[in-house]
Amino acid sequence: MVFSNIKSRSGQKMAIITSFFKDEAYGLLGPQMAATVIEDNTPYDCIVIAVTREAGRTSIKKALVDYFGKERPIIGFSALSGREDLFSLALELKAEGAITILAGPQANVDFVGEQGWQNHPHRFKGLSANFNFGLHGPAEQVIPLLNNLDEDDRSEIPGLLYVDQDGTVNQNTPKDWDEKYLRKVRWDNIYILKRDAIALLNINMGQVLQHIGCPYAARTRATEIDYPVSIESRQAESIKLQLRGCSFCDVAVDKGFYGKLDMETVIDQIRCLPQAQDGRKIPFELINENPLPNLPDLLREVHKQGLKLSQINLTLRADWFISGLQHLRQALPAAAAAGIYVLLSSIGFESFDDTILRNLNKGISVEKNIQAIRLMRQLKEEFPNQIGYSTKEGANHGFIHPTAWDSKETEANIQKTIYLYGLQNDILPPHSTPLIIHHASGLGDWIREIEHREQLWFKRFGSIIGWWESPHHL
């Protein structure tokens, strides 16, 4: 399907551009639910355009021209993964007359810019020049904006960020989450660039939201984070911080922990999932960082409602897997009776060195990680056809490497643990994930404190702080 074949109800159109990985076929709950909210509550038709790093700007702009025709483009940008190519695309489209809106996670801090950038020229200056508006918080906040685009007074639009005529950035307080907007999602509204055209993406993996935010980010914890190894003279020193959640997690700062959604809301989302050829719902990731205590109740309700599921993917911390294991054992026989496969798709191990785990503020130890792995392997022996956990079965567990604290000692500890417990056989992902420091994460505060103390500065790459480069003297 190409854009010119997409029929508009009213001639008013909007698109949401989001970052995507090549050759994947998963859905994107946030942008696709936002597009659904827009279509159901405004005169606008809305699609999601998933853009990989390989996509050429000329191809993207041609697709937008084909979609919008002579209408002024209204384009949202969400979940951009810090991609500077998409930041500059938004700036170019805005200069050409499009209305561009930055939304999704970290929209507020990325629109406003890094803390103290006005007095520190090397810091991320924000994206207020790239976008007409920012929108932080629930997607339905865009409804009054779209219904009043030509109004000058925007002070009553919740969650909106915009620049006054005098250059001042205004931030309106966002509204609370409202579950009536979280019940429905269209999964047939996402498109990709393919052979110089836009094609409908037939997804094979969906998402269902059960928790907003992470329970580990619900409260603040005192922590100490070591200096990076790049500053050799300070290896015995650390920075004291008050952090919510893992130190690298910008979502912990963005959302914290809102809480659990009603079972009815979760079931309504499951109903929206497409069916596979066998009549069952396609596999989905359950968005809940601590899903095991509620899993038996969810499966009972699914059975009560007559829903046919194929596979549930679970993402959680290693310690919460251990503490919730009895609930998983309770749920697996019910899953077996219903023909549902459970995949422990991503356990947040992140490292197998205690120093690095402490600096990541994970709140767990290598011993806990290994205990979880032993229990996962044991569970697989008990329920060989009902549960999966290994990379061969499609799991992709958290493993952050390299980090700012890598040394000969940490490397030796990690390699020893990997080979002692055979982690390369079933746990380690094909590629590790380098430590990424978003400017608004806890580690962003850590970097800025080091810069202040040592009169140094680290290079910024858009919204990301380049910890891997040698620092410069002020």
Where are the regions a protein language model picked out?
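Extended catalytic-interface subdomain
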Residues: 159-163, 169-215
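A short, flexible N-terminal coil/short beta segment enriched in small residues
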Residues: 1-44
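Conserved SAM/AdoMet-binding glycine-rich loop
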Residues: 7-19, 74-76, 101, 255-396, ...
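Canonical Radical SAM [4Fe-4S] cluster-binding loop centered on the CxxxCxxC motif
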Residues: 199-263
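A general structural detector for well-ordered alpha-helical segments in enzyme core domains, enriched
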Residues: 34, 63, 85-92, 120-123, ...
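Glycine-rich beta-alpha loop elements in corrinoid/cobalamin-binding modules
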Residues: 47-176, 426-430, 440
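C-terminal accessory regions of radical SAM enzymes
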Residues: 8, 13-23, 159-164, 169-173, ...
